[in-house]
Regions:
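An alpha-helical, amphipathic repeat domain used for nucleic-acid recognition
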Residues: 1-172
């Protein structure tokens, strides 16, 4: 019994001696250059929407006004562009086998307005049929949908992927 008390006391002592890491951003004044550097690091990896970048910076820094000022400057310097982000995102998701409905929904979640999203989603609207056919081919291979059950299964899959009925009616 005494041995278990000793182990318990030792564990308690170890926990109390380990200090919690302090949030360095709250204890030190944040400089706009630090926020800009962090934003540039994120933008160097891939394009971001303003909303995405803002969310990521707010996780690191607590100064709302400074973050917004830095974001405004990045837009003015053409380093942050909703248009470039939208174009890259549509291309990326289309190559991954997703349709226009799902991509539009994801863009809305990332703060992109519908007008800008529609511009890139409907640039090559005839390509969506080919994308739907490729997604179907990848998932189901050359299996022809002979019975109704298989047709419905393929239909549900393509709808889930964000394709519209008229994009895939003739390929099922």
């Amino acid at each position: 019994m005494a041995n278990s008390e000793t182990v318990s006391e030792t564990m308690t002592d170890e926990r109390s001696s380990v200090s919690e890491p302090e949030n360095q951003h709250e204890s030190q004044p944040v400089k706009p250059v630090d926020i800009r550097r962090s934003a540039m690091d994120l933008l160097a990896r891939r394009e971001h929407s303003r909303l995405e970048l803002s969310r990521k910076l707010h996780k690191r820094f607590s100064h709302y006004e400074t973050i917004e000022t830095v974001l405004d400057q990045l837009v003015q310097d053409q380093l942050l562009s909703e248009k470039r982000f939208t174009e890259a995102y549509v291309s990326y998701r289309k190559r991954a086998g997703f349709g226009p409905v799902k991509i539009a929904s994801e863009l809305r979640e990332r703060g992109i307005n519908d007008v800008l999203a529609d511009k890139f989603l409907h640039q090559n609207s005839e390509d969506w049929r080919a994308s739907a056919a490729a997604a179907k081919q990848k998932k189901f291979g050359d299996i022809a949908a002979i019975d109704v059950k298989e047709k419905l299964r393929q239909h549900r899959f393509l709808l889930y992927r964000g394709f519209r009925r008229h994009d895939f009616e003739d390929i099922i």
